Amino acid sequence: MTYLSQIEALLFVAGEEGLSLRHLASMLSLTPTALQQQLEKLSQKYEKDQHSSLCLIETANTYRLVTKEGFAELLRAYAKTPMNQSLSRASLEVLSIVAYKQPITRIEIDDIRGVNSSGALSKLLAFDLIREAGKKDVVGRPHLYATTDYFLDYMGINHLDELIEVSAVEPADEEIALFRTQD
């Protein structure tokens, strides 16, 4: 693995919150100067690559992967996709986690799912099923997410306490079989 690929992977997983220079340097065991050189290489790679939609930005010593400006119109159109499209499995997973664990941060959602949830969160925000509900009082002050009144309408319920209790949902026999161990 190259430093560039490791930086790219870390920034991808960090999503919109990005990572500080100090945190990246620590993760990669690089000096800040050596890391800045690698970040510059990555930035130049994205600038030169016309087949990539990504670019690297830095704000207040925090680095993020974002889409290039030329994709703004396409992404705006995507964000306005009508709600009659079904939600992806990832979006449904994230929506369920937010509904049952709210208020919750993206990192906490990622920890539960084991994968990055930025895309699903963005889609759910665009569909007004979830909202930002403040910031958690921890280092980095990450956004907290909660469901909206539209979520209640969408689910056909009046209050969150009408959600099915998680313990009431029984896994299918096939799912149980996956977790059985053979002695």
UniProtKB/Swiss-Prot annotation:
Record keywords = Cell cycle, Cell division, Chromosome partition, Cytoplasm
Q: Which GO terms describe its biological process?
A: cell division; chromosome separation; DNA replication
| InterPro entries for the chain | ScpB_csome_segregation, WH-like_DNA-bd_sf, WH_DNA-bd_sf
Q: What is its main location?
A: cytoplasm
Q: Where is it found, in Gene Ontology cellular component terms?
A: cytoplasm
What the entry lists under Gene3D superfamilies is as follows:
Winged helix-like DNA-binding domain superfamily/Winged helix DNA-binding domain (1.10.10.10)
Query: Which compartments does it reside in?
Result: Cytoplasm
User: SUPFAM superfamilies, alphabetically?
Assistant: Winged helix' DNA-binding domain
NCBIfam families given in the database record: SMC-Scp complex subunit ScpB
Which family is this protein grouped under? Belongs to the ScpB family.
Function, please? Participates in chromosomal partition during cell division. May act via the formation of a condensin-like complex containing Smc and ScpA that pull DNA away from mid-cell into both cell halves.
HAMAP family from the entry? ScpB (MF_01804)
> Assembly state and interactors?
Homodimer. Homodimerization may be required to stabilize the binding of ScpA to the Smc head domains. Component of a cohesin-like complex composed of ScpA, ScpB and the Smc homodimer, in which ScpA and ScpB bind to the head domain of Smc. The presence of the three proteins is required for the association of the complex with DNA.
Q: Which PANTHER family match?
A: SEGREGATION AND CONDENSATION PROTEIN B
Under what name is this protein listed? Segregation and condensation protein B
